[in-house]
UniProtKB/Swiss-Prot annotation:
Keywords: Ribonucleoprotein, Ribosomal protein. InterPro entries: Ribosomal_bL32, Ribosomal_bL32_bact, Ribosomal_zn-bd. One of its GO terms (cellular component) is large ribosomal subunit. The keyword Lipid biosynthesis does not apply. One of its GO terms (biological process) is translation. The keyword Amino-acid biosynthesis does not apply. This is Large ribosomal subunit protein bL32. One of its GO terms (molecular function) is structural constituent of ribosome. Belongs to the bacterial ribosomal protein bL32 family. Pfam families: Ribosomal_L32p. It comes from the Bacteria. Residues 24-48 are annotated as: Disordered.
Amino acid sequence: MAVPKRRVSKTRAAKRRTHYKVTLPMPIKDKDGSYKMPHRVNPVTKEY
């Protein structure tokens, strides 16, 4: 079983975790001008 040889400092652990970001979903402008989330059915036009 893998065990760390030395303790990982708070700074080093934080530097590694900087890439664990949550990306916000970008709304897409539909044909009728309304915005919808990607891969969702538009409630107004009932289109995907």
